[in-house]
């Protein structure tokens, strides 16, 4: 039984350098042969490439793909900002990563928690397995590995630090990165241009802070805001 959820997190979590990972992705799009990684076997190459393709390089449409690739291949964002962009992209591309982030990491961050550990991820995965046994037919050892690798990913993305119990790191979202985030969320889920867009939850802002940020005069070049009571519709502008 294959199940609905993939184990891509386990492969991606084993990659030592995410800066090189971004270079590898850019090189794939430039059709270069030198990946920057050294693999022991062809099987390892195939496993790695498959995890990148299915766990990162999945897109809603061509606009979404172009937005991501241009952001990681250009010089507009720092490496730390590109890590956050990669974090958001993995949320879209990998269903299990999205569920762990939505139900474990983001609640801890929004609650102002200082630390997070693999046991929390494992507890959630066990619960998910009970709710969807056919979708997650994994052994306990695989669940445990996934919970651990998930925290490894967060650490390499700059969102956590430490060894066993990870310290939660709150990223700095610059205005430029915020503009990218809004464009990404509305491009990844184009049918929902309201604050109920499911991807807006991952922006590190509570609802009131998000509204205030959206309405900043500096952002009028990028979108229009239409408000009816407590409902807000975001209309992206073509500014490039």
Language-model regions, residue ranges each:
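Amphipathic alpha-helical interaction surfaces
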Residues: 107, 127-131, 153-160
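DNA-recognition alpha helix
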Residues: 115-133
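Short helix/loop segment immediately N-terminal to the Walker
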Residues: 132-142
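Accessory, usually C-terminal, subdomains that scaffold auxiliary metal cofactors
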Residues: 155-231, 236-238
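Eukaryotic partner-binding/assembly regions in large regulatory complexes
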Residues: 1-107, 116
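Acyl-donor binding region in acyl/amide transferases
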Residues: 110
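Short amphipathic alpha-helical interaction segments
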Residues: 43-48, 96, 140-156, 203-216
């Amino acid at each position: 039984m294959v199940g609905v959820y993939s184990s891509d997190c386990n492969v991606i979590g084993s990659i030592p350098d995410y800066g090189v990972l971004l270079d590898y992705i850019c090189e794939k799009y430039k059709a270069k042969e030198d990946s920057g990684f050294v693999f022991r076997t062809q099987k390892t190459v195939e496993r790695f490439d498959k995890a990148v393709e299915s766990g990162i390089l999945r897109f809603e449409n061509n606009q979404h793909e172009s937005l991501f690739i241009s952001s990681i291949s250009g010089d507009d964002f720092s490496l730390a900002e590109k890590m956050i962009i990669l974090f958001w992209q993995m949320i879209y591309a990998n269903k299990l990563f999205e569920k762990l982030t939505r139900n474990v990491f983001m609640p801890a961050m929004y609650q102002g928690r200082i630390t997070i550990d693999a046991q929390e991820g494992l507890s959630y995965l066990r619960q998910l397995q009970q709710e969807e046994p056919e979708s997650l037919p994994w052994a306990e050892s695989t669940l445990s590995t996934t919970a651990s690798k998930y925290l490894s990913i967060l650490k390499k993305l700059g969102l956590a630090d430490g060894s066993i119990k990870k310290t939660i790191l709150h990223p700095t979202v610059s205005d430029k990165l915020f503009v990218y985030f809004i464009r990404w969320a509305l491009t990844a889920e184009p049918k929902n241009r309201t604050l109920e867009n499911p991807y807006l939850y991952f922006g590190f802002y509570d609802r009131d802070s998000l509204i205030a940020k959206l309405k900043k005069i500096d952002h009028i070049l990028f979108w229009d805001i239409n408000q009816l009571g407590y409902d807000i519709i975001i209309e992206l502008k073509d500014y490039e």
